[in-house]
Every structure is written in C-alpha cells, then in structure tokens.
Swiss-Prot record:
The modification Phosphothreonine is found at T107. InterPro entries: Vif. It is found in: Host cytoplasm; Host cell membrane; Virion. A motif (BC-box-like motif) lies at residues 157-166. Processed in virion by the viral protease. The BC-like-box motif mediates the interaction with elongin BC complex. The gene is vif. One of its GO terms (biological process) is viral life cycle. The lineage of its organism: Viruses, Riboviria, Pararnavirae, Artverviricota, Revtraviricetes. Belongs to the primate lentivirus group Vif protein family. This is Virion infectivity factor. It comes from Simian immunodeficiency virus (isolate GB1) (SIV-mnd).
Amino acid sequence: MERVERIVRLTWKVSSQRIEKWHWLVRRQMAWATANNEEGCWWLYPHFMAYNEWYTCSKVVIIINRDIRLIVRSYWHLQIEVGCLSTYAVSIEAVVRPPPFEKEWCTEITPEVADHLIHLHFYDCFMDSAVMKAIRGEEVLKVCRFPAGHKAQGVLSLQFLCLRVIYGPEER
C-alpha cells in the first residue's frame, strides 16, 4: 500500500474575487509606501516566486517590526469539490525571530489577531502625538479606522482624549 503524506494547515475559504482584491490592496500599499519614501514593509511574492510551495497562489510578507512578521499565503486548487474546480483559501502565519542565535518559531493566527497586530503597528491610534496634534489644530494623517482593535483596551474617541488633556484628569 502506498504511503500518503498530508500537510494540514488552518485556512479560510475565500472567493477568487477576494484574492484579486487582496492582491490589488497589497500592490496599492506597496506603491503608496514607495511614493512616500517609506521602508518596504509589505512584500508580494507571486506564485512563480514562491518556490517549493505547491498550490500557493501568492505569498505576502508583512513586516510588523524587526522581530515579527506576518506571512499571508493564498492557495488555489486545494480540493476538487463536486462541480467546482477552483477552490481558494488563505492562511495567516506569524513568524517570530528572537535575538541572535535563537531559533525562529512560527504559529498560525486568526484574521482578527492579524488585524489587531497590523493595526497597532501601522496606525498611531490616538497616542500622545496624535492628541497633541489635534489640540494644536494640526492635521492628524493616520486616523483610526478600526475601533474594534481597541475595545479590549478601552480607548475612547479622539475628542474625549483631547478634552481630558486640556482639562486634566477627572476629579471625583
């Protein structure tokens, strides 16, 4: 009997239109970063550059900081279902590279955790600098568009934070 080896990955089934939209968004992010002379934090590897990764449609590497990066792989033709030839799926992996001479490790994460990590790194989310800019009347370029990422931390609106800074802490 022939031995069959299988690799099991956590994946989320998506449509081909979502994959195309994802590729477009990544390309726009890369073009925007290039136009603003920022370091490349997002890298797109098409299927022909993802060596030895069968069924990989594309691989996107998102660098969170020096030690952590997210790898988003989109797969195609995973399982031929009845009457369906093209099946697309996405997996998200967090790779942690600790200080030198230690082995890197990786884990698969959910889209919610990936959203939270990306949001906390790429948006200043009403930190002290954003509050001070708003008080001075300067334009706050990075606007928090993902308030669900702060529900656990209890971050309030930017206007409330500005009022708290101007009038001091609430006295009881």
